């Protein structure tokens, strides 16, 4: 598990990416719920 990118740990990249993906999905669900994403 020592094979990292050198500067940023791989688990940190995975965690941040997961949070961004979940936030983006939640944002799209919120937009479609409030009617802002109904035109997409």
From Swiss-Prot:
Specify whether RNA-binding is a keyword of the entry. no
List all membrane-crossing ranges: 8-28
Domain of life, source organism: Eukaryota
InterPro entries attached to this UniProt entry: PSII_PsbJ (IPR002682), PSII_PsbJ_sf (IPR037267)
Membrane topology is: Single-pass membrane protein
Keywords assigned by UniProt, alphabetized: Chloroplast, Membrane, Photosynthesis, Photosystem II, Plastid, Reaction center, Thylakoid, Transmembrane, Transmembrane helix
- Quote the SUPFAM superfamilies the UniProt record gives: Photosystem II reaction center protein J, PsbJ
The subcellular localization recorded is: Plastid, Chloroplast thylakoid membrane
A GO biological process this protein is involved in?
Answer: photosynthesis
Per the record, the major location class is: plastid
Question: What range does the record give for the signal peptide?
Answer: none
Provide GO CC annotations from the record: chloroplast thylakoid membrane; photosystem II; photosystem II reaction center
Pfam families assigned to the protein according to its UniProt record, in alphabetical order:
PsbJ
Quaternary data: PSII is composed of 1 copy each of membrane proteins PsbA, PsbB, PsbC, PsbD, PsbE, PsbF, PsbH, PsbI, PsbJ, PsbK, PsbL, PsbM, PsbT, PsbX, PsbY, PsbZ, Psb30/Ycf12, at least 3 peripheral proteins of the oxygen-evolving complex and a large number of cofactors. It forms dimeric complexes.
- PANTHER family, per this entry? PHOTOSYSTEM II REACTION CENTER PROTEIN J
Q: What family, per the record?
A: Belongs to the PsbJ family.
Summarizing the function annotation, the protein's role is: One of the components of the core complex of photosystem II (PSII). PSII is a light-driven water:plastoquinone oxidoreductase that uses light energy to abstract electrons from H(2)O, generating O(2) and a proton gradient subsequently used for ATP formation. It consists of a core antenna complex that captures photons, and an electron transfer chain that converts photonic excitation into a charge separation.
Q: What is this protein called?
A: Photosystem II reaction center protein J
Source organism of the structure: Zea mays (Maize)
